[in-house]
From Swiss-Prot:
It is a multi-pass membrane protein. Pfam families: COX15-CtaA. One of its GO terms (cellular component) is plasma membrane. Heme binds at residues 273, 334. Keywords: Cell membrane, Heme biosynthesis, Iron, Membrane, Metal-binding, Oxidoreductase, Transmembrane, Transmembrane helix. It catalyses: Fe(II)-heme o + 2 A + H2O = Fe(II)-heme a + 2 AH2. It is an enzyme of class 1 (oxidoreductase). InterPro entries: COX15/CtaA_fam, HemeA_Synthase_type2. Its cofactor is heme b. This is Heme A synthase. Interacts with CtaB. The chain crosses the membrane at residues 25-45, 111-131, 141-161, 176-196, 210-230, 269-289, 304-324, 326-346.
Length: 358
C-alpha cells in the first residue's frame, strides 16, 4: 500500500525512510523555487512601477545575462532605448545615470527569470537520474519547466508591445504575464504542499471544491489587478468607499462596444477590481461558515479564519494604496500580500485533500 501511494504522488518507493528523505528533498527544492518566483514577481512589480520595463529593447536569452561593462557599451544600450516611443514622448532628455537606474531593474528581473530556469532544470535532472522522482511527478516538473519557458516568451511578447507605437506595454499582455507567473507559483506550491504529511483527515469534497474555487477567484483578482496596473487605473478614483461620489459611477461605459470598457477604460477596470475584491472576501467568509458548520474545530476550519483575515488585510492595503494614489512602497506591499493570500489559499486547498500516504 505504501509503495502504491508513493508511486501515486510520483516518488520512488524504496521503503519509508528513503521515501521520506526523497519527499523532503523535493519539497525543499520546490520551496526554493517558490521563493525565487516570489522574488521575480516582486522585482517585476518594481520594474513596472518605476517605468523600467522597456529599458532593454532586445531579447537575448543567453548574452543578455551580461550587462554593459564600460561607458561605450552603456552609451550603445542607451541609444537603443532612445529609439522607442517611451523615450521620445515621455523620457526625452533623460541622463545616462537615470537610464542606468531603470536598466538595472529590468536586467535584475530578467536575470532572476533565467536563474529560476536553472533552479528547476538542474535539480530536476539530478532527482530524475538518481531515482528520486517517478511517474507523475516527473511529468509535472517537466510541465512546470515548459510553462516557465512559455512565461519567458510571454514576457518578451509583453515588452514588444511597447517598443513600436505605445509608450508602455499593453495592459492585456501585462495582465497575462502576471497571471501566468501566479499560475506557476500556484502549481509549484500546490505540488510542494502535496508532499507534506498531514495529521488530519481530508475534508469532504464540497469543502475541497470551494477551497479550489477560492484559489481561482484570487487568480482572477490578480489578473484584474494586472489590468489596473497596466492602465494606471489606480489613479482614477482615489476615494473610498464611493467613487466620484457614487456607488456606481456614471462614466463606466463610455467606450463602444461596451465590453471594451472592462479592459480599456481605467475607471471601469478599477471599479471591477474593487467589486471583485469584495466578492473574494465574501467567498472567503462563506467558505469559513461552510467549514465551521461541517468540520467545526478542525485544522481545516481554523485555516479558514486565517484566510478571511488575510483577505481582509489585503483589502485594507488595497484601500490605503488607492487613497494615497499608489505610491511605490504601498503598490509593492499590495502586490506582495496578494501573493501571500494566494499561497495560503493554495496551501489550504491542498490540505483539504489530506495527506499523501508514505
Amino acid at each position: 500500500m505504501a509503495a502504491t501511494s508513493a508511486q501515486h504522488i510520483g516518488l520512488q518507493g524504496h521503503g519509508t525512510s528513503r521515501n521520506d528523505r526523497d519527499r523532503r528533498l523535493v519539497r525543499y527544492w520546490l520551496y526554493a523555487v517558490f521563493a525565487v518566483l516570489i522574488a521575480i514577481v516582486m522585482v517585476g512589480g518594481a520594474t513596472r512601477m518605476t517605468g523600467s520595463g522597456l529599458s532593454i529593447t532586445e531579447w537575448k536569452p543567453i548574452h543578455g545575462v551580461i550587462p554593459p561593462l564600460n561607458h561605450a557599451e552603456w552609451v550603445e544600450e542607451f541609444e537603443k532605448y532612445q529609439q522607442i516611443p517611451q523615450y521620445q514622448q515621455i523620457n526625452k532628455g533623460m541622463s545616462l545615470a537615470e537610464f542606468q537606474y531603470i536598466f538595472w531593474w529590468e536586467w535584475a528581473h530578467r536575470l532572476l527569470a533565467r536563474f529560476v530556469g536553472f533552479l528547476v532544470a538542474v535539480p530536476l535532472g539530478f532527482f530524475w537520474l538518481t531515482g528520486r522522482l517517478k511517474g507523475g511527478l516527473k511529468y509535472r516538473m517537466l510541465g512546470l519547466l515548459a510553462l516557465g519557458g512559455l512565461q519567458g516568451a510571454i514576457g518578451w511578447w509583453m515588452v514588444a508591445s511597447g517598443l513600436s507605437e505605445l509608450t508602455s506595454v499593453s495592459q492585456y499582455r501585462l495582465a497575462i504575464h502576471l497571471t501566468t507567473a501566479c499560475v506557476i507559483i500556484t502549481a509549484v506550491f500546490y505540488i510542494a504542499r502535496g508532499l507534506v504529511t498531514y495529521s488530519e483527515r481530508p475534508a469532504e469534497r464540497s469543502i475541497q471544491r470551494f477551497a479550489g474555487w477560492i484559489v481561482f477567484a484570487v487568480l482572477v483578482q490578480i489578473y484584474l489587478g494586472g489590468l489596473v496596473a497596466g492602465l494606471h487605473a489606480g489613479l482614477t478614483y482615489n476615494t473610498w468607499p464611493l467613487m466620484d461620489g457614487a456607488i456606481i459611477p456614471s462614466d463606466l461605459f463610455t467606450q463602444a462596444p461596451w465590453w471594451r470598457n472592462l479592459f480599456e477604460n481605467p475607471k471601469t477596470v478599477q471599479f471591477v477590481h474593487r467589486m471583485f475584491a469584495y466578492t473574494v472576501l465574501l467567498l472567503a467568509i462563506l467558505h469559513a461558515v461552510q467549514v465551521w458548520k461541517n468540520a467545526p474545530g478542525t485544522t481545516h476550519a481554523r485555516r479558514t479564519i486565517v484566510l478571511v483575515g488575510l483577505v481582509f488585510i489585503q483589502a485594507m492595503i488595497g484601500i490605503a494604496t488607492l487613497l494615497m494614489s499608489a505610491p511605490l512602497h504601498l503598490g509593492l506591499t499590495h502586490q506582495f500580500f496578494a501573493l501571500v493570500v494566494l499561497a495560503f489559499a493554495v496551501a489550504h486547498w491542498r490540505a483539504t485533500k489530506g495527506a499523501y500516504a508514505a
